Amino acid sequence: MRIAVIGAGKWGSALHLALKENHNCFISSLHQRDLEDFVSIKEALECEYLVFALSSQGMRAWLKENFINKGQKILIASKGIEDQSCQFLDEIFLDFVPKENFCVLSGPSFAAEVMQKLPTALMISGINQELCKKFASFFPDFIKTYIDNDVRGAEICGAYKNVLAIASGISDGLKLGNNARAALISRGLIEMHRFGKFFGAKEETFLGLSGAGDLFLTATSVLSRNYRVGLKLAQNQKLDSILVELNEVAEGVKTAYAIEKLAKMKGIYTPIVNEVVAIFKGKSVQEATQSLLKQND
């Protein structure tokens, strides 16, 4: 049995380190990297189990260009919604593999702490519960895994919390205090729940690892790149320059645009996301904050 992680960024590298503890695990990306266990894309696709840790915005293009379905079992470890199509990642993968052959990984997990082998808990979601159990068995003892079948809930929580982390970073960057941040996060959880319920996500997902757990982590720590984007926006830095300086993918940026478009199409009330997008488009953080404070629900 062989496992390959597709994507050699921080999260992909952390997953590779964890999975190789007890299994024959490789890592691959489009560009040659000087990494232990690195293999070509062609070699990686020969593995029976694939873990995808690519940018959500580049996932479809990568699959179109490189993927050959050989019955591989897939774990989607990326978090985001494709901006151009407003599709969730599981919808994108359905164009390439049957739904019985993939699961979604979610939960509160900073790559840096996984690399340090610090205790972590993750959720694996899929309609094929036996496959979920199989992927769960691959992880080492310092990672506790749970399984469920709420793929859509896991996808939405994993994507939405990144946008809320940007908003939380803005709040902290403006030095609005712990009370304000707590209010923002709790209202954000309600907003995420409202959005997710429209698409069929399950109630319990929002209060579990995929929802509240990942949101609380991502929205309160400078280890979160999305939170750091918010901090810099609060300093009146331009988004483009922030992303260049970051030199990493902040999934919450493109996902915010996708959620805003979906919410408008479906008539879902998403005030926090709307204000984050307005800030991206030039609205002052102070004005956006005042707009949120005036919201009644």
Curated annotation (Swiss-Prot):
Binding site for sn-glycerol 3-phosphate: K79, G107, S109, K161, D214, S224, R225, N226
Active-site residue numbers: K161
Gene Ontology cellular component list: cytosol
Record keywords, A-Z: Cytoplasm, Lipid biosynthesis, Lipid metabolism, NAD, NADP, Nucleotide-binding, Oxidoreductase, Phospholipid biosynthesis, Phospholipid metabolism
Catalytic activity as recorded in UniProt: sn-glycerol 3-phosphate + NAD(+) = dihydroxyacetone phosphate + NADH + H(+); sn-glycerol 3-phosphate + NADP(+) = dihydroxyacetone phosphate + NADPH + H(+)
Localization terms from the record: Cytoplasm
One Pfam family here: NAD_Gly3P_dh_N
GO biological process: carbohydrate metabolic process; glycerol-3-phosphate biosynthetic process; glycerol-3-phosphate catabolic process; glycerophospholipid metabolic process; phospholipid biosynthetic process
EC number: 1.1.1.94
Entry-linked InterPro entries: 6-PGluconate_DH-like_C_sf, 6PGD_dom2, G3P_DH_NAD-dep, G3P_DH_NAD-dep_C, G3P_DH_NAD-dep_N, NAD(P)-bd_dom_sf
The keyword Ribonucleoprotein is assigned to this record: no
Binding site for NADPH: W11, R33, K79, A111, R225, V249, E251
PROSITE patterns, per database record: NAD_G3PDH (PS00957)
Pathway it works in: Membrane lipid metabolism; glycerophospholipid metabolism
Molecular function as annotated in GO: glycerol-3-phosphate dehydrogenase [NAD(P)+] activity; NAD binding
Function statement: Catalyzes the reduction of the glycolytic intermediate dihydroxyacetone phosphate (DHAP) to sn-glycerol 3-phosphate (G3P), the key precursor for phospholipid synthesis.
Family: Belongs to the NAD-dependent glycerol-3-phosphate dehydrogenase family.
Protein name in UniProt: Glycerol-3-phosphate dehydrogenase [NAD(P)+]
UniProt lineage: Bacteria, Pseudomonadati, Campylobacterota, Epsilonproteobacteria, Campylobacterales
